[in-house]
C-alpha cells in the first residue's frame, strides 16, 4: 500500500554525509531513510544497498556515490553517501554532488579523526555552506563528560575552519539503534531531531532560475541582416529581449544588448536556466565573441587570472598521469567550455604532487576567465583529463 503519492511541491535540498572512515556515515544514511520513510513515506534503503555504490563519471573522473532520497514534513532531500575517502575527495572537488549542506558524522567513542578534519577543510574549500553534526555511537559512551568533551572538540575544529562552531547543531545518537527501531533518546528520536535540524538550519537554496543571468558561450554565428547569434545553455537566471548584458572573459569586457532569444528555431521573449538557446546580440561583431566567454548580467561577474584552488589529481589507474608534477607545472584548465593554459604554484614545503593526491594550489592563467569562488574546472594535458578542481579564492 503506497503511503500517499510523491509530492513534487516540497522544496528540494541536496545534502550528504561526510566524516572519518567507520564513524557510521552509511549506517546513518540507512537509518535516516528507514526512520523517515515510516513517517513520511518513500523508500527505505538498507546498509548493503547504500554501501554498494554505483560508479558515475564527473568531469572525466570516475566516482562511486550512493544516492538516496527522503522526505520530511516540509522538504524533499537528495542525499549522497560515498564508500571511500577518495570518493569523498573527488565528489566534493568535482561538484558531482553539489551539497547545500553536509551531515558530519563523528563517532562519540573516537572523537574527531584525520578525515574528520580533512572533510571539514574540503567543505570549506569547495564552498559547502552549512554543516550539521551527528555525534554517532552514543550508545558506546557511558560517560556524559566524555560526550561533552568530544562535542567541544568538534565545535573547535569547525570554528578553526571558519564554520560557526558554537552555533552548529550537534545531534547525539546511535544510527545502529535507530536502524533497529530503538525508541530511547539516542535511537529513532535522534533521527527526527536530525531531520528537524536539516529543515531549520539549512536554508532553502536559491533556484537556478532566480540567480543572476549567466550563459557560457558554446558557439557563435553571424546571420546576415540580423547580427551575431551566441548559443549555449543558460546556467542561471533569465535573459529577456531588450536586456543589457556583458560578454566577459578572455578579452576586455564589452556591453551589448539582447535583441532576440530563440530555442528550437522559435523566437521567445526570454530564455531561462536550463534552456539551450541562441541569443541575438545587437551591434556585436562575430569576432568579438568566442567560445569560453560568458554572457552575464551587467556587473555580476568579473574576469580573473589568479586564484587558489583545491584540486584532485587522477591516479595512474584512473587514466591520469603516471608521474608526479612539480612547481611551475603548466597544464590546461578547462573552464565551462574552453581550455586556458595556467602555471601552477605548489604550497610552501610541497616538493611535488603525486597522481592520486589532493592539494591546494595557486594558479596564474595566461588569459582571464569569468570567475567566481566555487567554480569547477578540469585539468587537462592535450585534451586528456588529468585532474579536477574548484576555485577556492580569487586573488586577482
From Swiss-Prot:
GO molecular function: GTP binding; GTPase activity; guanosine tetraphosphate binding; translation elongation factor activity
Annotated EC: 3.6.5.3
Catalyzed reaction equations: GTP + H2O = GDP + phosphate + H(+)
Residues the record lists as binding Mg(2+): 26
Subcellular location(s) of the protein: Cytoplasm
Protein family membership: Belongs to the TRAFAC class translation factor GTPase superfamily. Classic translation factor GTPase family. EF-Tu/EF-1A subfamily.
PANTHER family found in the cross-reference section: ELONGATION FACTOR TU, MITOCHONDRIAL, ELONGATION FACTOR TU-RELATED
Protein name: Elongation factor Tu 1
